[in-house]
Structure formats: C-alpha cells, structure tokens
Amino acid sequence: MARILAATAGAPYELEHPELTRHAPFKVVCADPPWPFGDSLPGPGRGAAKHYGVLSLDDIRNHRFVGGEVLDPRRDLVADDAYLFLWRVSAGADIATLTFAEEAYQVARAWGFAPKTEVVLRKQTKNGKRHFGMGWHIRNEHETCVLAVRGKPKPLVQNIRSVIEARVSRRHSAKPEVFYTDIVEKISDGPYVELFARSTRPGWTCLGDEVP
C-alpha cells in the first residue's frame, strides 16, 4: 500500500511514486471526493467540513490522478478498459445543489469515464433497522455511487446487483465491506486504487491524507 498525501490541488499525488508505477495501470478506480457541501447543514458536527477538508468542484474535476488536462498523458495510470466508482452526496436541503448529482456525472466525464448506471447503498442502523438520515423534504436512507467506464471493460460475473444493504459506520463517510466484496472485487480482478481513501485495504493502492 502507498500512503501518498494529497488533500488539496496545491499538494497533488506524486505520480512517479514507486507504489503507483508498480501497480499501474489500474483497472478499477474508487473515489469518494470531499464534495464542498460542508457548511450547508446546520448543527454541530453535521457537515463534511467538520470531519475532513473539502475541495471545490473545479479541484475535483481537475484531480491530477485522472483528471482532464491536468494529467500528463504519458503518465496515465488508468488502464484503457477500466471502471470508476464515484460516490456522491445523497442528502441535503436542496437536491439540485447539495446532492451533486449532475456534478458527479460531469466529474466522471472530466476524468475520462462514461457514466453507465448507479449503485445504491441502503443504510441500516446497528440494530439492523432502516436508517433515518438527513434531508429537508424527505429523510434519506441511502447513498449513491456512479458507475462509469473507460473503454470496454468486461465484468467478471453477470449477477452483480446494484443495491446493497449495510449497517452504518460510526466513521463519517466510511463505506461498508459489502461494497468492496459484493460489487467492486466481483466486477474486476484489479489492480485497484482508491482516491481520497481514509483507510487501507489488502491488495489495494489507497491514496489519501487520512490513510494511516
């Protein structure tokens, strides 16, 4: 695993880092960007900015690892046929501005991927009951992940479902084990890279300023 610190556009990933060049090109990219909605939710500890540094939409679109014109094409670290799993915000006061639905698709395209479908994480409480989340119009109980492709990747199996259920982690924005085992690691045998990671995972290259 590589611990390569990168939280802002001014501190990009070291693209020549041996851990990256050794495992590239990556066939799966997972990303849970720090979307800039941190100050929109009232109350202590509710916004993303309370838990980690957020980025502007332009910084996310132009992310150096895979993003647009910023990346030197000679150092492309993503395979010609690859998958992108891009998490977006699924709760907020105004669905047009706080869920970043359209922006997530824009980011995927800016990174060179074509959006195809979505994965839905239906949350449960620690007791296995339905999660009662945030939202002003209705209370959300799910998170959404855009699945996009680059080139023509082929899934390893054909029976992967788009909806998963899992108990909510106490750690902000942490994704459940079932997301990796039942979807990501079934659709491709890697190599895998996770951007904006907050923990490590065996067999993955995990990049982020919170990676231990």
Protein language model regions, located:
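Class I S-adenosyl-L-methionine-dependent methyltransferase catalytic core
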Residues: M1-P212
